[in-house]
From Swiss-Prot:
This is Peptidyl-prolyl cis-trans isomerase B. GO terms for biological process: protein folding. Pfam families: Pro_isomerase (PF00160). PPIases accelerate the folding of proteins. It catalyzes the cis-trans isomerization of proline imidic peptide bonds in oligopeptides. Its EC number is 5.2.1.8. It is an enzyme of class 5 (isomerase). Belongs to the cyclophilin-type PPIase family. PPIase B subfamily. It comes from Aspergillus oryzae (strain ATCC 42149 / RIB 40). The lineage of its organism: Eukaryota, Fungi, Dikarya, Ascomycota, Pezizomycotina. One of its GO terms (molecular function) is cyclosporin A binding. Inhibited by cyclosporin A (CsA). One of its GO terms (cellular component) is endoplasmic reticulum lumen. It is found in: Endoplasmic reticulum lumen. Residues 23-180 form the PPIase cyclophilin-type domain.
C-alpha cells in the first residue's frame, strides 16, 4: 500500500529543526499586499524543498525575487515561479532545467498548500502554485512540498485580483522580496 498522507497529518507531525521557512513580500500594481510565510516539508520531499528554498534566497544567482504570479484562478490556485519568461513557459531548478517528481506522499487536501507546477511527469523546474481549495484531482501528478504558515489573507487577495483572458492578473502581482527566515519554533513539531 502506498504511503499517502493528508496535509493535516503531515502538518501535525512535519516540522523539526530541519524546517526551512521562507517568505515572499508581495505587491499588486506597485502597492504592497503583504508577506506570505511558507513552511517547507524538507524531510518528506528534501530535494523539492531545497530547490524552493534556494530559489527563495537567490543564493545560486537566480530565483523568485522580482518574479510574478502569472496565473490566478479563483477557487483553485495562484501560480508563480517563472522567473525567466514570466508567462508560465519558463523557469529552471537549481539542479538544471527540470528535475524528477520526488514523491507524491502528501495529498492536496486543503487550501494553502504549496505544490510544484509542471508540464507533465518529471518536469519540475521553479514554477509552483498555492492551493485556495482542496484539489484532490492533482494527487499523484504534482508534488506537495509545503504550506502557508502566515499571510494566507495575501493569497486570498491575489486570488481575487481582476484578471485578463488567460487567468493573468490585470495588474502585475510581484514578489518584490524573498528569502529564508530563522524560526524560533522550528523544533516544536515532530516531522516524519
Amino acid at each position: 500500500m502506498t504511503d499517502l498522507r493528508s496535509a493535516e497529518e503531515i502538518t501535525s507531525q512535519q516540522y523539526s529543526s530541519g524546517l526551512a521557512t521562507v517568505y515572499f513580500d508581495i505587491e499588486h500594481g506597485n502597492k504592497p499586499l503583504g508577506r506570505v510565510v511558507l513552511g517547507l516539508y524538507g524531510k518528506t520531499v528534501p530535494k523539492t524543498a531545497e530547490n524552493f528554498r534556494a530559489l527563495a534566497t537567490g543564493e545560486k544567482g537566480f530565483g523568485y525575487e522580482g518574479s510574478t504570479f502569472h496565473r490566478v484562478i479563483k477557487e483553485f490556485m495562484i501560480q508563480g515561479g517563472d522567473f525567466t519568461r514570466g508567462d508560465g513557459t519558463g523557469g529552471k531548478s537549481i539542479y538544471g532545467e527540470k528535475f524528477k517528481d520526488e514523491n507524491f506522499k502528501i495529498r492536496h487536501t486543503k487550501k494553502g498548500l504549496l505544490s510544484m507546477a509542471n508540464a507533465g511527469k518529471d518536469t519540475n523546474g521553479s514554477q509552483f502554485f498555492i492551493t485556495t481549495v482542496a484539489t484532490p484531482w492533482l494527487d499523484g501528478r504534482h508534488v506537495v512540498f509545503g504550506e502557508v504558515l502566515e499571510g494566507y489573507e495575501v493569497v486570498e487577495a491575489i486570488e481575487n485580483v481582476p484578471k485578463v483572458p488567460g487567468d493573468k492578473p490585470q495588474q502585475v502581482v510581484k514578489i518584490v522580496k524573498s528569502g529564508e527566515l530563522e524560526s524560533e519554533d522550528k523544533g516544536s513539531h515532530e516531522e516524519l
